[in-house]
A protein has these predicted regions:
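C-terminal, low-complexity/hydrophilic appendages and adjacent surface loops
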Residues: 14-108
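Long, internal low-complexity/basic segments
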Residues: 17-18, 26-27, 48-50, 86-88, ...
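His-Asp-centered acyl/peptidyl-transfer active-site segments
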Residues: 2-12
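Short, intrinsically disordered low-complexity segments
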Residues: 6, 57, 65-68, 137, ...
Length: 155
């Protein structure tokens, strides 16, 4: 059976605040190397991860193409146009039939691949709607009002 016989695309998502900003690990390692408690140092220095970084992932694979959006947890989005897609996301698009090693990102040529980018974005949005429902960050921990502003880090 073809991979798309059951659904138009498979969905992969990742939302992890701890790994959204790699400077968290650098900060913790330096504090530990200095013999200090990373949590206490973070509190004293007011260190917080930069949640504007695009570390969250939504990805779809339709049997040939893998389409991935990387976005900030502060900017959950459902882009409908090419401009919106690239405004709120870092984008990857690979043709796994021709490029199984995912080395040639087709999203780098927006103009040439506009129709394919938008088609794969629609498949991704459909998979999100079907499998997640409302994709607004509610899977993230314990933040009232869905603002995602952190006042501490858990190391």
């Amino acid at each position: 059976k073809a991979i798309d016989a059951v659904r138009d695309a498979t969905l992969f998502t990742y939302s992890g605040l701890a790994s959204n900003d790699a400077t968290v690990f650098d900060f913790a390692a330096k504090a530990a190397a200095a013999g200090k408690d990373p949590k206490e140092e973070a509190r004293k220095e007011g260190f917080k991860p930069d949640l504007r970084k695009r570390g969250h992932v939504r990805s779809a694979f339709d049997g040939r193409y893998r389409f991935t959006r990387y976005f900030s947890p502060l900017d959950h989005n459902s882009p409908q146009t090419l401009d919106q897609l690239f405004k709120w996301n870092d984008v990857e698009l690979y043709d796994l039939a021709k490029d199984p090693g995912e080395t040639a990102n087709l999203a780098l040529d927006r103009k040439k691949n506009e129709k394919l980018l938008l088609a794969m974005n629609r498949k991704l949005e459909a998979a999100i709607k079907k499998e997640i429902g409302k994709d607004d960050g509610r899977e993230l921990p314990d933040v009232a009002g869905v603002t995602w502003g952190l006042d501490r880090i858990d190391l």
